[in-house]
């Protein structure tokens, strides 16, 4: 009987907001529009960072990687979410769920590490401007970006491998829009303390350590800016890092709220909190990638000029 209860699952049912079917059409339209904006905005940033020689700098190299990450991250979940809104049978295969978990976690981890690298880049640019070309040479910033991707892929491969080996005892209803790793782990009918410990270690290494690097970098940046006597100089120095700081606050604010809430929430109304988790996850998964190009371009003259001259590039010529 015990073996029978642990039958291998072939598919998962994505519950999402199926309890509110009238909202599904509204969510479909909103998420579809946001996804188009994500593709256009981040795609444009990638193009200009490649085609415009003036943007061949470490900062825009990292920004191009960040934009590519946002496109990959949203593409792992949004298309399937849109299909599920229009389909009566909201299912995903076990292998498809595993792939979605792997890609989503890999992209999320890579972005955490990459934001830390970008903070260090801004620290060197503002606090050590004369040594910036030496410290942030191509031999430095390319391995930094590659290391971010490597960390994300390895972390995701390890965690996903352990999760897919868990027994689910025919529990296949995921209370989420997509195969988010925590939502899948909740279905396991075995002790997941090992998985939770592994996730804790990964969170410290790939989320909190980059956050610590960001905090230290910006503490030194703010200290350096305050030493500048002219208000114009302070304003110019702060404008070079304000966009990145805004993105960091939105990204980390959302992710820390999601994954570091106290466990006492289980004693409260679980349905309301599940709905809250899903709404926050949607904000984290859609709003942040959509806002990143806007944040980086609104106060950036170089980006505005590059976008303005983009149609005249040889890339578009016959």
From Swiss-Prot:
Annotated function: Odorant receptor.
Annotated localization: Cell membrane
An example molecular function term from Gene Ontology annotations: G protein-coupled receptor activity
UniProt GO cellular component terms: nucleoplasm; plasma membrane
UniProt protein name: Olfactory receptor 13C9
One Pfam assignment: 7tm_4
Membrane topology: Multi-pass membrane protein
Coiled-coil stretches noted in the UniProt entry, renumbered to this chain: none
Main location: membrane
GO biological process: detection of chemical stimulus involved in sensory perception of smell
Residues in compartment: Cytoplasmic: 47-54, 121-139, 218-237, 299-318
Positions on the Extracellular side per record topology: 1-25, 76-99, 161-197, 259-277
Classification via InterPro entries: GPCR_Rhodpsn, GPCR_Rhodpsn_7TM, Olfact_rcpt
């Amino acid at each position: 009987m015990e073996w029978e209860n642990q039958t291998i699952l072939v598919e998962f049912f994505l519950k999402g907001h199926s309890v509110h079917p009238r909202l599904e059409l509204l969510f479909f339209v909103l998420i579809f529009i946001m996804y188009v904006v994500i593709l256009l905005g981040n795609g444009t940033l990638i193009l200009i960072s490649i085609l415009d020689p003036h943007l061949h700098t470490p900062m825009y190299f990292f920004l191009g990687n960040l934009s590519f990450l946002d496109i990959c991250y949203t593409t792992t979940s949004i298309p399937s979410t849109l299909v599920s809104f229009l389909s009566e049978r909201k299912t995903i295969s076990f292998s498809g769920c595993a792939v979605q978990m792997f890609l989503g976690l890999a992209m999320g981890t890579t972005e955490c590490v990459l934001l830390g690298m970008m903070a260090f880049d801004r620290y060197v640019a503002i606090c050590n401007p004369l040594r910036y070309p030496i410290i942030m040479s191509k031999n430095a910033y390319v391995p930094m970006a590659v290391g971010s991707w490597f960390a994300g892929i390895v972390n995701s491969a390890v965690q996903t491998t352990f999760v897919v080996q868990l027994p689910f005892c025919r529990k296949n209803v995921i209370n989420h829009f997509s195969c988010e790793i925590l939502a899948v782990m909740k279905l396991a009918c075995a002790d997941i303390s090992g998985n939770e410990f592994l996730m804790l270690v990964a969170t410290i290494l790939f989320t909190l350590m980059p956050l610590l690097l960001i905090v230290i970098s910006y503490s030194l940046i703010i200290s350096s800016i305050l030493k500048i006597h002219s208000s114009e100089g302070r304003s110019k120095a702060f404008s070079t890092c304000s966009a990145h700081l805004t993105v960091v606050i939105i990204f980390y604010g959302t992710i820390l709220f999601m994954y570091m809430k106290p466990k006492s929430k289980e004693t409260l109304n679980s349905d309301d909190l599940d709905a809250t988790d899903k709404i926050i996850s949607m904000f984290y998964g859609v709003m942040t990638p959509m806002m990143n190009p806007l944040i980086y371009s609104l106060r950036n003259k170089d980006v505005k000029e590059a976008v303005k001259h983009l149609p005249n590039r040889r890339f578009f010529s016959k």
